[in-house]
Amino acid sequence: MLLAALCCLLWSFRTSAGHFPRACASSKSLMEKECCPAWTGDSSPCGQLSGRGACQDITLSKAPLGPQYPFTGMDDREAWPSVFYNRTCQCFGNFMGFNCGNCKFGFWGPNCTEKRLLVRRNIFDLSVPEKNKFLAYLTLAKHTISPDYVIPIGTYGQMNNGSTPMFNDINVYDLFVWMHYYVSRDTLLGGSEIWKDIDFAHEAPGFLPWHRLFLLLWEQEIQKLTGDENFTIPYWDWRDAKSCDICTDEYMGGHNPANPNLLSPASFFSSWQIICTRLEEYNSRQALCDGTPRGPLLRNPGHDKARTPRLPSSADVEFCLSLTQYESDSMDKAANFSFRNTLEGFASPLTGIADASQSSMHNALHIYMNGTMSQVQGSANDPIFLLHHAFVDSIFEQWLRRHHPLQEVYPEANAPIGHNRESYMVPFIPLYRNGDFFISSRDLGYDYSNLQDSERDIFQDYIKPFLEQASRIWPWLIGAAVVGSVLTAVLGRLTSLLCRRKRKQLREERQPLLMEKEDYHSLLYQTHV
């Protein structure tokens, strides 16, 4: 009933998220390589007449890249987004968006001057109505076509360098599934040749900033779709879990009794269709995923013990947080003692040494789900993806608060393609740099309930010894206060008496030795009888 009501009531809400704006998918925009749509508020490109932004040339980073990708000019994602556009909206102040029609993260209001902090909460701390609303929002997004964005179904070359646009509509939820596919897909080299050692969002420094932006845009999209400006993505704290405790019909879907690889018919998500999962087919055809439905969600948690013998523990997380280096060595999945590589799951959470034979931390959850979520390109089809990555982001945030790194700690050069600090993140339009999200979540308008609680605990632990010491000397303090009060009263009385005596002496000393002139003459001319 809740879902039906939401669908009927909110179907007309317009949305905006990330990737190819519908307004920039024409042959004119592609051939002119310009994406500067008009803002509806004043009908000028980028809201320029209202001072919101301007259409400007894109300045690309010239920092050298790592050796992992040896080609140039073979992939549309290289030097993003220059293959498609070299001019986009550059927004001013707190404005943001492909036409500068939105506010930067953390700002609200018609002029983006109101600053607010939203809090992401543990999904198990949500009330039943809150949890049901979250599930309904997910399903609404799955059934609402994005009015503002489309997905390309061919490369720029296959579009005849923009003269023959190839784009499809897509629903709001699947837009983000497609983006996660596109950022991590293989490079199509022509014929039947591909290059697999490439990923613009994983296995390198940009893993955490990219997924941070992905969640922020997804969150913003749901806020606009539903009109619920207070919506935040809940997180799943999987530390020390013995099983998938959110894999129930009450939450993210239980087992189908007839087929353990499918979801229960009673689940919100049992009827969902997945996209972008046939990678070998796309590669063999040298084609992109076109958003065609490919069957139901698959999930059978905990049945690949060889690669994932257990879920991550609290000790594993604490070891990650203790690592002082964000990135190290080759800055890829072979990096040792790297916080990013250990949290991502390519290095052991016991030693910090890269280990290709095991999947730990973030990777462990994907493998543990044993289904759609276990394949990188299609993993965002499973809504557990959002809850999982929200918790991964909270660990990233905890590391930032513990170590207080300068932005310069994020690698400026020699990272794998797409991962340098000043590189624009694929496939987002408007444009965002990796380094822009190597900052505290509070500067982006959100926090985590578990981090707020832990900070209060840290403060209480800090002052606890002082409070205990104060409790031991409390009787003495009371006695001292009483004695002090008596002494203060006595001293005050003595001081008052001394002051009065002093004032009397001063009055006598201040009497004039000679009379005033008038009094003197009056006395002088007095007659005597």
UniProtKB/Swiss-Prot annotation:
Cu cation B binds at H362, H366, H389. InterPro entries: Di-copper_centre_dom_sf, Tyrosinase/Hemocyanin, Tyrosinase_Cu-bd. GO terms for biological process: melanin biosynthetic process; pigmentation. It catalyses: 2 L-dopa + O2 = 2 L-dopaquinone + 2 H2O; L-tyrosine + O2 = L-dopaquinone + H2O; 2 5,6-dihydroxyindole-2-carboxylate + O2 = 2 indole-5,6-quinone-2-carboxylate + 2 H2O. It is an enzyme of class 1 (oxidoreductase). The chain crosses the membrane at residues 473-495. GO terms for molecular function: metal ion binding; tyrosinase activity. Residues 19-472 are lumenal. The keyword Signal applies. This is Tyrosinase. The gene is TYR.
